[in-house]
């Protein structure tokens, strides 16, 4: 079984929340990027952040 690719934390410098345009934090355990201001968590799949509101989990 192969592991899925790791998220490149350097992406955090370039990515912002599509709703609030605020910064994001990385939750390694859940593999999500979290926008505390918008109260949304965006999934990371195969090392790629899915920055669609329709895919986000409400906090």
Swiss-Prot record:
HAMAP family: UPF0434. Belongs to the UPF0434 family. Signal peptide: none annotated. Disulfide bonds: none annotated. SUPFAM superfamilies: Trm112p-like. It comes from the Bacteria. It comes from Cereibacter sphaeroides (strain ATCC 17025 / ATH 2.4.3) (Rhodobacter sphaeroides). This is UPF0434 protein Rsph17025_2896. Coiled coil: none annotated. InterPro entries: Trm112-like. GO terms for cellular component: cytosol. PANTHER family: PROTEIN PREY, MITOCHONDRIAL (PTHR33505:SF4), ZGC:162634 (PTHR33505).
